[in-house]
């Protein structure tokens, strides 16, 4: 979820003990901020909540300032510029400063929550890049056929285009594109669409596959990829050979930590050690990773939404990462009849 967001709203409690608990080493709040930054969410708003429950005085400016200072310090270490992060004192329970300015905190002169949200810069949608559309689902619709569904992350999808699906290399023509039951001339980044493809069985395309333009840097399967990874929670040490599940865009596939190349300083990114024997909670590292099954990923620089991932094991997020480079497999996939017609290949 975090990897799809344009802005992060970090909610921290202001009540006595509540903030300390949430913001402790064991608390989730720090992890949420780190996760957001690592996964490319560059805009942050902090809501300091439960202002109606501060002690000894309700709606305490002193408590607000104390929390703002501590959270700012942490956000700076993560990589955010606290000067650019609005801190809004709110009460979700009482409704203070959510959509209307509260008379309980006359000392606060900044934007209220809804204004801070309205002030977010919409990110530039990369429609000039080649098409990448990770599939969320594939439906079989009577009388229409196979309809893959997903969000256009980069580029443009149009009827008549011959798309290539990675990691299989399957090529076929797009007959039509729909969003919310309306036919589109073209779909652009951010659009959640369904598109109809001919001569393709539901078994051939799956969630986690990526549609791309067969004529413009088509997506391919990754033999391996190099990633910068931050370990958030692991009870022991992570050795080469560790194979947890990696969630990247809509794909959910076990990947092996094949080679631990370097251990890094988490804040500066400088190398601390080559070929470490293991890494543990709190470490950052450059790792060569190998998918256990065919998988399509991209470097973060070229295609950000396909270049960041979460590592999951033991029902929690063990690590997050950003892909630096991909070693691609040359795909020799099936070309359907409609693709041959559309491209004039016999």
Curated annotation (Swiss-Prot):
It comes from the Eukaryota. It holds the Pfam family GTP_EFTU. One of its GO terms (molecular function) is GTP binding. Keywords: Cytoplasm, Elongation factor, GTP-binding, Nucleotide-binding, Protein biosynthesis. SUPFAM superfamilies: EF-Tu/eEF-1alpha/eIF2-gamma C-terminal domain, P-loop containing nucleoside triphosphate hydrolases, Translation proteins. Residues 1-127 form the tr-type G domain. One of its GO terms (cellular component) is cytoplasm. Its main location: cytoplasm. PANTHER family: TRANSLATION FACTOR. This is Elongation factor 1-alpha. It comes from Eimeria bovis.
């Amino acid at each position: 979820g975090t990897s799809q967001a344009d802005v992060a709203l970090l909610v921290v409690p202001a009540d006595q003990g509540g903030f300390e608990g949430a913001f402790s080493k064991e608390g989730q709040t720090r992890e949420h901020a780190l996760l957001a930054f690592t996964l490319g969410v560059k805009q942050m708003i902090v809501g300091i909540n439960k202002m109606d429950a501060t002690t000894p005085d309700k709606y305490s400016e002193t408590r607000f300032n104390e929390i703002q200072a501590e959270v700012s310090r942490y956000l700076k270490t993560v990589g955010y510029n606290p000067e650019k992060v609005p801190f809004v004192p709110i009460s979700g329970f009482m409704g203070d400063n959510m959509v209307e300015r509260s008379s309980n905190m006359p000392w606060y002169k900044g934007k209220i929550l809804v204004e801070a949200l309205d002030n977010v810069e919409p990110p530039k949608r990369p429609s000039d890049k080649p098409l990448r559309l990770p599939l969320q689902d594939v439906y079989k619709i009577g009388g229409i056929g196979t309809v893959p569904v997903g969000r256009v992350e980069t580029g443009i999808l149009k009827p008549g285009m011959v798309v290539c699906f990675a990691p299989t290399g399957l090529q076929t023509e797009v007959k039509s594109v729909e969003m919310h039951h309306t036919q589109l001339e073209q779909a652009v980044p951010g659009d959640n669409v369904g598109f109809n493809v001919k001569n393709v069985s539901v078994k051939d395309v799956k969630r986690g596959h990526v549609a791309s333009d067969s004529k413009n840097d088509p997506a391919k399967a990754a033999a391996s990829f190099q990633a910068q990874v931050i370990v958030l929670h692991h009870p022991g040490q992570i050795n080469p050979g560790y194979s947890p599940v990696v969630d990247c865009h809509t794909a959910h596939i076990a990947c092996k930590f094949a080679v631990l190349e370097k251990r890094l300083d988490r804040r500066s990114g400088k190398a601390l050690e080559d070929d470490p024997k293991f890494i543990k909670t709190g470490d950052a590292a450059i790792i060569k990773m190998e998918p256990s099954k065919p998988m399509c990923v991209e470097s973060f620089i070229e295609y950000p939404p396909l270049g960041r991932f979460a590592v999951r094991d033991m029902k929690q997020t063990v690590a997050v990462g950003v892909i630096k480079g991909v070693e691609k497999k040359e795909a020799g996939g099936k070309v359907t009849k409609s693709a041959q017609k559309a491209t004039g290949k016999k």
